Amino acid sequence: MNKKITDSIIYVGVNDHQIDLFEGQYVVKNGMAYNSYVIFDDDIAVMDTVDINFTNEWLANIEEALNGRLPKYLIVQHMEPDHSANIENFMKKYPQTIIVGNDKTFKFMSQFFRNDSFLNTLVVKNGDTLSLGKHTLTFVFAPMIHWPEVMFTYDSFDKVLFSADAFGKFGANDVKEDWGDEARRYYIGIVGKYGVQVKNILNAASTLEIEKILPLHGPVLSAPLTHYLEKYTVWATYGIEKEGVLIVYTSIYGNTKSAAELLKNELLKLGTPSVEIYDLARSDMAEVVGKAFEYGRIALASPTYNMELFPYMDQFIHKLVERNFQNKTIGIISNGTWAPVSGKLIKDKLSLLKNITFLEPVVNILSSVSAENKDEIKWLARELAKGYSISTSDVDKHNTNSLFNIGYGLYVITTNDGKKDNGLIVNTVTQLTNTPNRVGVTINKLNYSHYIVEKTKKMNVNILSTDAPFSIFEIFGFQSGRNVDKFKDIGVHRSDNGLVYLSNYINSFMSLDIVSSIDLG
């Protein structure tokens, strides 16, 4: 499948729908893409090969793209077999080609192919350049992203960064899906251990003028690239993407599951903006590991098994430790009958990591959840939900200071249809009377939010501040809440009426009950 990327760069990669496990461990229900590119100039360069199972398709793609011309260079950015397996087959067809790589590239090449016939080579160093004519390629070494020989290639003519495995994702390119979730799962699984190295290469890339990023997996990323770079910065620095609490549990006879479900319900009562719960025995481990990096607050619940951690929890924690998991707040629920040590084992293993805060004490269950345990779980929920809820104990519900922030500007009204949160940009909010306090909000009755407000008789009004970015207007003004989750990448809290309000870009918010409505036509 050939595709034009720029006037002089053609995509010649392949999609793999035969694969079920990437690297023998990651479930890829939508397959994988193995990307390869051809740069056309006075001299032609082919960027990387593809998996061995797609030799014929890939070579046919290249032949079609070349249209009778011959390549001068094969640039090898990464020697992992899903990208290098066809070097030998390529050289048999185009023996005049010069293979470009670094010292480690050729060391690994000799180990994989045991072939001394690759004599037509060009060894490059970090920062070296290669002219193809109009195109000048600069090689930027990116060791341990995620192998030691990896290098990126910057094309200053088309302002393109060939990024090897960085900025890749799971999934074939002929499947339409959100980039973020599968890119996160890919990053955490494949590159997550090497945050320092990723941060260093991001700093180096920030000095370049880049309009497109061409990874070895996943789609080509085009300007504006801010969203993708911001995500990688958060992942590389082990930052928090999503406010809320992640609950991860294992259970043998259902008692630990009951404790985890009780914690979930208590967190929801407290207005926690997002609560996700996963049973490790019935979940994709890589997905849950990715979720653990997404949240800043996590609860782990596990029984003891043969005086050790239950195997799924042990494996989960091993994967966190292996990936330098850090900067988290952890609550622990331990269960056991005759040797209840799971809580201690969880804490001992995670104590090896940086900036892990444990909520003490551990909730210790003996076989089944007792009345005392229920109180302890409620306490744990309050600790995990701190700062998330606005309740009557925190504020005066009749405080009218928000009214002074009403002016000519824009507002986001937030609602909930009983299944999910929704939000909408409006431009007219007016204080109608002072005694009693009455506020008028104008909503287009064709919008889904109008239907929700009429049904639920409540809403929150978020008064936007002057620093609200244009992306806020795009999210809440340019798409329908019927079909998308508008709060997917937005920080929120939840007020005691059960509705969310924005945690950023607002001066204040008001929780309103609907006492009457007027149809203006």
Name every feature range the model reports, one short phrase each.
Residues N2-I62, F152-D155, K159-F162, T256:
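Conserved beta-strand hairpin/beta-sheet module of binuclear metal-dependent hydrolase folds
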Residues S393-G521:
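Active-site-proximal mixed secondary-structure blocks
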Residues N86, D284-V288:
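Short acidic active-site motifs
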Residues K212-E241, Q315:
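Short N-terminal or domain-adjacent regulatory/targeting segments
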Residues D42, N53-V100:
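Active-site metal-binding motif and surrounding structural segment of the metallo-beta-lactamase
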